Amino acid sequence: MNRNKREKEYYSIDVGDSTFTVLKRYQNLRPIGSGAQGIVCSAYDHVLDRNVAIKKLSRPFQNQTHAKRAYRELVLMKCVNHKNIIGLLNVFTPQKTLEEFQDVYLVMELMDANLCQVIQMELDHERLSYLLYQMLCGIKHLHAAGIIHRDLKPSNIVVKSDCTLKILDFGLARTAATGLLMTPYVVTRYYRAPEVILGMGYQANVDVWSIGCIMAEMVRGSVLFPGTDHIDQWNKVIEQLGTPSQEFMMKLNQSVRTYVENRPRYAGYSFEKLFPDVLFPADSDHNKLKASQARDLLSKMLVIDASKRISVDEALQHPYINVWYDPSEVEAPPPAITDKQLDEREHSVEEWKELIYKEVLEWEERTKNGVIRGQPASLAQVQQ
C-alpha cells in the first residue's frame, strides 16, 4: 500500500496519557482500562457497525520479555476460537515499514464489565454456576491447545449483561518462572495455585484452584487469600485450609521445604466454617442448585495438593455445574496452534519484532482476501 494512502486511513487521538493512532473506521474512543500489557479503549467500528475494544500494546519492543509476550498474545488470539475466550476482530499497525514498526493494536469484542464488578453483585445460584461453567469451558479449550493459564483472575475475565463470559488473556508463558523465594514484583497473586507459589511442577488442574478462589470470592464478596507477596500468600492459604501433609512436603525442593516446614502449623477450618449457608443465595427451585452443592465444589477445587484436586472435566460434571452441560461448548474443536514451541524459543528483540510484524501483515493479507480463520463469515468481509 502506498505511504500517502496508508496515512490517510489513520488518525491520532490522545486517550488518557497515551496517543492512539487508529484506522478511521474506529471512532468515539474512550479509555476503559489499562494493565501491564497495554491500554484498552472502547470504540465504534463503522465497518462492522458495532462497539469494539481496542488494545494498544504498551511498548512491546522495550525488552525481550515484552516482545515475547506480545508475540504470544497475538499468535494465540489469532488461533483461538471459542465463545468463552475473547475474539480477535482486527490487528493493525499505523507504521509502514519494519524499521518504523513500534505499535501493535488488537481489536476485540467489547464486553460490559469485568468480573471484579460482578463480584460485588448479589448473584443467585443460576448466575453463579453459569459463570463458573463458562470459565471451565474456556479453560478446557485452552488446555486442549496445550495452554495452561496459571494466572486466571477476576480482572482478566469479562462478562456481558446477559451473563455471557469470556477469558481475556492466556496467562503465564510456560517459561515464566515463579516461586516462593523469588524476588517479588507487583502482580496479583491471590488466585495462584500453591504449586505456582511454591515453584513446583504443575498440571492442568492448576487452573481449577484459581477458579475455586474466584468462586469463593463471588460467594464471600471478598478475596479469600489476600497475600501481599508469595510468602504471605502461602501463609494465608494454610491459615484457612490447614498445613498440608508430610506427603505433600516431600514433593517440594529442599530450600522451599525447609522454609515451609518451619512455618507455624495450622489445623485450618472446615468448609462449613469458611463458607456457611448464610453466605450463599437461597436454594434454587428451577435447577435444584443448593448451597451444599456449591460448598462441595469449593471443597474439591481448593485442595492444596494438586494430585487430590479435581480436574476441569470433573468440575464440569459436578452437580453444581453440569446443569449447563452442552457438548458443543465443552468439546469444541481445539485451536490449531502449529507453533508448539511458542514459549520455548528465545529471540532478540529485533527478531521478535520481525516475527510480530509478519503476523500483522499476514492478518492484513487475510482480511483483504476475505479470509479470517476462526471468525464467522460475516466478519470475513472486513476490509482495512
UniProtKB/Swiss-Prot annotation:
One of its GO terms (biological process) is JNK cascade. It is an enzyme of class 2 (transferase). Its main location: cytoplasm. GO terms for cellular component: cytoplasm; nucleus; synapse. Dually phosphorylated on Thr-183 and Tyr-185, which activates the enzyme. InterPro entries: Kinase-like_dom_sf, MAP_kinase, MAP_kinase_CS, MAPK_JNK, Prot_kinase_dom, Ser/Thr_kinase_AS. One of its GO terms (molecular function) is protein serine/threonine kinase activity. The keyword Cell membrane does not apply. A motif (TXY) lies at residues 183-185. It is found in: Cytoplasm; Nucleus; Synapse. Keywords: ATP-binding, Biological rhythms, Cytoplasm, Kinase, Nucleotide-binding, Nucleus, Phosphoprotein, Serine/threonine-protein kinase, Synapse, Transferase. CDD domains: STKc_JNK. Its EC number is 2.7.11.24. This is Mitogen-activated protein kinase 8. It comes from Danio rerio (Zebrafish). The gene is mapk8.
